[in-house]
From Swiss-Prot:
Name of the protein this chain belongs to: Cytochrome b
CDD domains (alphabetical): cytochrome_b_C, Cytochrome_b_N
Transmembrane residue ranges: 33-53, 77-98, 113-133, 178-198, 226-246, 288-308, 320-340, 347-367
Pfam family, one: Cytochrom_B_C
Family per similarity comment: Belongs to the cytochrome b family.
Keywords: Electron transport, Heme, Iron, Membrane, Metal-binding, Mitochondrion, Mitochondrion inner membrane, Respiratory chain, Transmembrane, Transmembrane helix, Transport, Ubiquinone
Compartments (UniProt record): Mitochondrion inner membrane
Miscellaneous comment in the UniProt entry for this protein: Heme 1 (or BL or b562) is low-potential and absorbs at about 562 nm, and heme 2 (or BH or b566) is high-potential and absorbs at about 566 nm.
Amino acid sequence: MTIMRKSHPLMKIVNHAFIDLPTPPNISGWWNFGSLLGLCLILQILTGLFLAMHYTSDTTTAFSSVTHICRDVNYGWLIRYMHANGASLFFICLYIHIGRGIYYGSYLYTETWNIGILLLFLTMATAFVGYVLPWGQMSFWGATVITNLLSAIPYIGQDLVEWIWGGFSVDKATLTRFFAFHFILPFIIMALAMVHLLFLHETGSNNPLGIPSNCGKVPFHPYYTTKDFLGAILLLTLFMTLVLFFPDKLGDPDNYTPANPLNTPPHIKPEWYFLFAYAILRSIPNKLGGVCALVFSILVLALLPYLHTSKQRSLSFRPLSQTLFWTLVSDLIILTWIGGQPVESPYIIIGQVASILYFSIILILMPIAGLIENKMLKW
């Protein structure tokens, strides 16, 4: 078997990626989230495939087909809630994974980091088009509001929106194409995740100390296969608890009402994992400015490798930067809360302050803190 895994062309790829891969001996539980994201992706593709077998992408039958899945299909309710809550789980793991990358300076592997940002954009696009498919009130109005943002683009905006809609409003054509996008995008994400891994394995993993660990690396199997397996069991336990006991906790009650173009919900808002970006969008009174801020709130991550001023890679021994990092985490939680609140005082001003703080920490305060820490260490 040993000879085969080292000589067979297919087995060799698996061997180099998951068995004999040299891995730092001191990577913590925060490094588990990469493999957990892979698990979430497989889970989403499998549950999605079974849902697609029963779903119909037509405005007249989409809502009732989802109801049919929950009521008449054997274990359909379980598959549907696993898929819906699996998206939330995916984004929890994704945000922790990005947070770990920022904390430990993993963004200095620029190719891996940039592909990761592209993966984040694709995942957000997949989640958005997927949220439209049940054709409930929030699905319809969410699709209308978010796609309408593109009309802020000068000259081509309105044409672009109508092109995406396939008409003059969100209708049958929109739903059909969104279903097609939602089906194909996860496979593109899977292919990109392979490229993400390919570039990661070119450089090797970073570690909590942020220093080279070539002299002490250990094989991935059995150490990290066991660790990842334990992480997967813990994650699935939490996930199934959520699915079986609190299936609607993270959803919107408005989505249990069929889409009605003549009745606008009192508060149109996306799923909870987009609320931070939605709050940034709403905090700018100008439409084009809001759209630019929304895109830049994610795109700003691509600037991190160029804003790294510290002589140390990780934040493990940098108290000033650590304080700023946890302030950023708190700020994102506040933005998420604000995104779900109505547009009225005091939420407007809180959202604006939190948005300014978000960009200030990343673009100004973190680089300055790095320089101050260098001075403190006389570097």
